[in-house]
């Protein structure tokens, strides 16, 4: 561990020290055309190439002296430490909507595996064909025999950004918007509670997965140690943002304000980080289509007051960002430039979804050449990673990482 604290994120751009990722696995090979939509994919990736691309991405980070941790490895280690596979399985199976005898049948089958194989099967999905045939006793079992899974695969797990997010020395363990992703944050909960790297750290949970409203990490940006920017999007509910703000104001000694920015509720703009990311002290990449021609959009400043929350509506997005960062001006670098066709194409392929690994230094997909050239022209050091298969899941370098530790900015 490189710092005393297991978690420390006080900006989007501080030197990245430790990051959590998930290498794409057999869960991607359980996607079929019939279930693309429900599993939140537009196409079926080629796993072998996807893994090569992800390995190159991880190597790019390691080459910059970033410690890369793997979700699947930490989850298995945490499960071994917890010494209670049955309780963990019961929770996972219950949230997979398996009940009655089928739940017991699935649990007994999975209990026969060691921790590594159990975690792998829970992530990849459990096909009905894997378990020996048994007599069906109930109507729902007989009517549902065409559906191939006892437990659905979790192909979005390689987007580790969304199930949880570190803010300061604490974390949000998120209630995901889509049912296909709800179980993902159970693995984060397991790791933080039982893995020896985290279990003795008394880590505050600012927002838990039992919350009634959805919140996802792709909408959570830590601008500085006093300010969190949260997108109200297709995946994050305004009520979740308000509850998060109240929790932070009551329990975090440093957070002074939460900014809520409203973005269109569309799949292409599913999270704030698909249209807006921080790349340097006063520089951001932005998809121009989220603002009107005057550069305006709805942004709300939430601050603590004597009567609870004080909410101030604003429209001048760029000015608000400059004010909270105490910068005279902010440079917005347009994803894809000024050409609306190029901008739309490169945003779709995550041209705005940069991962800052240090101030003025980012990782991007190689396919977004116009956006990458614009970043370089603005003085940003760009590391390009191969992306033909990774991009099929509709997420970029920021989406594929959960930063755990960054250096504090001086």
From Swiss-Prot:
One of its GO terms (molecular function) is arginine deiminase activity. One of its GO terms (cellular component) is cytoplasm. It is found in: Cytoplasm. The active site is at residue 399. InterPro entries: Arg_deiminase. It catalyses: L-arginine + H2O = L-citrulline + NH4(+). Keywords: Arginine metabolism, Cytoplasm, Hydrolase. It holds the Pfam family ADI. One of its GO terms (biological process) is arginine catabolic process to ornithine. Its EC number is 3.5.3.6. It is an enzyme of class 3 (hydrolase). Pathway: Amino-acid degradation; L-arginine degradation via ADI pathway; carbamoyl phosphate from L-arginine: step 1/2. Belongs to the arginine deiminase family. HAMAP family: Arg_deiminase. This is Arginine deiminase. It comes from Listeria monocytogenes serovar 1/2a (strain ATCC BAA-679 / EGD-e). The lineage of its organism: Bacteria, Bacillati, Bacillota, Bacilli, Bacillales.
